[in-house]
């Protein structure tokens, strides 16, 4: 496994750990986490098709995840006021709090790991550009 693959693997492992430790009460899956991440980036929420496109899964699979999250009180699903044919999804306060808790947990663990290393501060920009490029459809 090369360095990039190790970094990706460690990131997924860290997220899994954060989900099980920071918000064990919610028993979130990685798939559900991805939905919370996408919705947290959209102040006005997103349509189901927008969420599906961002996480790269089918509409039926996205709808199933959203129903599960809605039953747990993490998302609110309603008709889009601008386009009554569309359904808009938003994080609830609980969903936003869960997202914030997991992100904080990850940031704390990353800061702890980075503090013990002599890292080049200019590394962050190229890594951010790679992440941005990978997020493009």
Feature roles, as predicted:
Residues 17-60, 72:
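N-terminal helix-turn-helix DNA-binding core of bacterial DNA-binding proteins
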Residues 15, 43, 99, 131-135:
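A structural signal for well-ordered alpha-helices, especially hydrophobic packing surfaces
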Residues 1-27, 72, 134:
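N-terminal leader segment of winged-helix/HTH proteins
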Residues 10, 14, 40-42, 53-54, ...:
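Alpha-helical structural segments
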Residues 67-125:
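Charged, amphipathic alpha-helical coiled-coil/dimerization segments
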Residues 1, 119-137:
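C-terminal regulatory/oligomerization modules of transcriptional regulators
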Residues 5-9, 32, 92, 124-131:
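Generic structural concept
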